[in-house]
Amino acid sequence: MGIRSFRPYTPGTRQATVSDFSEITKSKPEKSLTKYKHRKKGRNNRGVITCRHRGGGHKRLYRLIDFRRDKRDITAQVTAIEYDPNRNARIALVQYEDGEKRYILQPAGLGVGDTIIAGEEAPYEIGNALPLYKIPLGTEIHNIELYAGRGGQMVRSAGAFAQLVAKEGDYVTIKLPSKEVRMVRKECYATIGKVGNAEARNLKLGKAGRTRHLGRRPQVRGSVMNPVDHPHGGGEGRAPIGRSGPVTPWGKPALGKKTRKKKKQSSSLIVRRRR
């Protein structure tokens, strides 16, 4: 993937950068692997806003991604690399020997014509899915299962990878992109390689309109609101917040307050917390 910039015809084009989409080989998605996605716009079942600053955005079709990789010991060939509006990573359309088609996250280095396979005896190659106990130490992996058979839940964003650092008993230890080190059951599957499109983090939106296309609405600072709307609001001109520390619109401590449950069951599997 390359990054394009523009001549400064407008303030928006002066700042913006976009992907050149050079790796995309197919423009329209596979119809059988898409479904309509009803967007919540930050509302719950009663229509009450539960997540602020969400709404609008371009309509999208959801691509059904195979995170489970549960079609075992059957070779598949990559037939296309596609754009997915629901994530920064690219997706690869693969076709199995029996004719079935599926989408997977495109690992860096996987292209059209390459073959992949999932299974305990799968070779050690990019795009193949294996149980963690079969993967050599130091390997870069992604799409990692937390529970065997549930499908990959960790390390799925563009450019992300984790590293296998130890194997002991029924667990393996992995180092996550957040620098957290945690243990996972050895039967859980992971895919070899790192997720492609790592340059996505370097893109600049350049203008408010592109942010709105993504479904994000403006964020208004609490300090410029009225006291009825936010605890930081009110005062004459630029006033301090008038509290010992910043709080949420509902008065709870914000910015630095730990929110993880102290008795969370998975805490026993975390060797080192993220920084």
UniProtKB/Swiss-Prot annotation:
Q: Which GO terms describe its molecular function?
A: rRNA binding; structural constituent of ribosome; transferase activity
Polar residues biased stretches:
12-22
- Skewed-composition ranges (Basic residues): 208-219, 255-275
GO biological process terms, alphabetically, are: translation
UniProt superkingdom: Bacteria
Q: Which Pfam family would be a valid example here?
A: Ribosomal_L2
Q: Which UniProt keywords apply?
A: Ribonucleoprotein, Ribosomal protein, RNA-binding, rRNA-binding
The reply to whether Cell inner membrane figures as a keyword in the UniProt entry is: no
Q: Family assignment?
A: Belongs to the universal ribosomal protein uL2 family.
Binding partners and assembly: Part of the 50S ribosomal subunit. Forms a bridge to the 30S subunit in the 70S ribosome.
Q: What is this protein called?
A: Large ribosomal subunit protein uL2
Q: Which organism is it from?
A: Picosynechococcus sp. (strain ATCC 27264 / PCC 7002 / PR-6) (Agmenellum quadruplicatum)
